[in-house]
Amino acid sequence: KVQEALKKYEVLKNEDAEWHFIGHLQTNKIKDVLKFADMIHSVDRLSLAEKLDQRLQQEGRSLDILVQVNTSHEESKYGVAPEEALSLVKQTARYDTLKIHGLMTIGLFTKDEVKIRKCFKVLKEINDNIVKEGIDRVDMKYLSMGMSGDYQIAIEEGANMVRIGTAIFGARNTPDAYYWPSEKTDADRAKQME
């Protein structure tokens, strides 16, 4: 994903665009991601926050981030466990270079709207609890949840940032091993669940 993003950035870097990195970020890819990312949606562990902070200090700048929460509890998905999200936000907020602006989650790949909705409700509850804490340098303005197949439910549950690439650009035939270790597209997975 990082290599793909870098290629796109090279083509479009002179355009007035805001670049968001979405996907599992390995610490050895931080330097490359920071070449283009205005925001990272997938900070899911303290070790990643520490490495980002170190690199950003070297570069003398800060970065907007979202903390990724695994509200579905699926082993194939990344994200901090819901019960550990508040702690991760508090610990990450210590780094002046990291500007926490909200949370991100990926709902279950299922046709069961009740289960999908539950994932989004959990993220909204975590968000509300973090807001109540009043943590310094934390501005919870984004709830990034919902993709092409479930964005309407996500919006109903409070999402103000959705990821709808498939609905706009069509299904991609590239593996997304960071979340779902297969060659299947979202459309393939949806058919499988029918």
Give the label of every model feature segment:
Residues 152:
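Conserved active-site alpha-helix within GNAT-family acetyltransferase domains
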Residues 1, 9-12, 155, 159-194:
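C-terminal helical cap(s) of enzyme catalytic domains, especially alpha/beta-barrels
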